[in-house]
C-alpha cells in the first residue's frame, strides 16, 4: 500500500450504522459501500433500535448519548484505539415530507454532531420503502411480477403516506411473493447492481440528503 491514505483506515477507524432494525441497517450498508467502496470491511453495526425523531431536549441528548457510547464501544471491539470515523443513524419519519421532516432532521443531527462531531441522521420520508419506489426496474429485478403502477412513477415519493402499503398491496399484489420488510436489502442490492441509483425515477428529498451526506462524509471524515 502506498503512503497516501485511501478511504477508511480500517485498522484505526470504522463507520458505525445504527437503525430501526437489521433490514434497515443492511440496506444502508449496501448503499454506503457503493458510494464509498473503501468502506467495505470497515462498517460495523449497533443492534439496538433507534428512537430519536420524537425526542427533544434532555431526552434527546440522553438517547443520542446512549447511541454514541454504543458506537464507541463497538469501534473499540475492532481493536484497541479504534475510533468512530463517522456514525450513520437511520430512522423512518413515518410521515410525509414537509417542515416537520426538515426540523426533525436538523434537531437530531445537530445533537449527534454536538456529541460526536462526525455523524449523519438518515431520516427517511415517509419510510425507507419510499426510496424503493424510485427504482421500479430494481423491484422487478427482485421479483419479475413486481410492478410499480404508473400513478406512482416519476413522483415525489416522499409525499406518499404509506409506501410500505403500496409495495405490499399494489406493487407485489396478492398473488405470488409479497413484499415484506426482510426484502429491503435484496431490493437495494438490485438497485446498486443494476446501476439504477444513478437515475431515480422520481424524487425524494431524504434520498437526496442521504447521498449528499455520504459524499460529504467521504471528503471530510474518511480520507486522510
Please give the residue ranges for each predicted region.
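C-terminal accessory helical subdomains adjacent to catalytic cores in phosphodiester-
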Residues: 2-14, 23-54, 58, 65-224
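Short hydrophobic beta-strand that contains or immediately precedes a catalytic carboxylate
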Residues: 17-19
Amino acid at each position: 500500500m502506498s503512503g497516501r491514505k485511501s478511504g477508511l483506515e480500517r485498522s484505526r477507524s470504522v463507520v458505525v450504522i445504527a437503525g430501526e432494525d437489521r433490514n434497515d441497517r443492511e440496506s444502508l450498508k449496501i448503499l454506503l459501500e457503493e458510494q464509498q467502496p473503501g468502506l467495505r470491511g470497515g462498517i460495523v453495526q449497533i443492534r439496538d433500535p433507534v428512537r430519536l425523531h420524537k425526542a427533544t431536549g434532555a431526552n434527546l441528548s440522553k438517547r443520542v448519548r446512549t447511541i454514541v457510547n454504543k458506537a464507541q464501544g463497538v469501534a473499540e471491539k475492532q481493536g484497541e484505539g479504534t475510533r468512530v470515523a463517522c456514525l450513520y443513524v437511520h430512522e423512518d419519519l413515518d410521515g410525509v415530507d414537509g417542515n416537520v421532516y426538515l426540523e426533525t432532521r436538523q434537531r437530531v443531527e445537530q445533537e449527534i454532531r454536538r456529541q460526536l462531531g462526525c455523524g449523519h441522521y438518515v431520516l427517511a420520508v415517509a419510510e425507507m420503502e419510499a426510496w424503493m419506489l424510485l427504482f421500479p426496474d430494481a423491484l422487478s429485478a427482485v421479483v419479475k411480477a413486481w410492478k410499480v403502477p404508473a400513478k406512482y412513477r416519476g413522483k415525489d415519493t416522499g409525499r406518499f403516506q404509506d409506501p410500505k402499503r403500496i409495495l405490499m398491496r399494489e406493487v407485489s399484489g396478492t398473488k405470488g411473493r409479497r413484499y415484506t420488510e426482510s426484502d429491503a436489502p435484496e431490493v437495494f442490492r438490485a438497485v446498486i447492481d443494476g446501476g439504477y441509483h444513478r437515475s431515480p425515477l422520481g424524487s425524494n428529498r431524504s434520498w437526496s440528503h442521504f447521498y449528499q451526506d455520504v459524499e460529504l462524509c467521504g471528503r471530510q471524515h474518511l480520507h486522510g
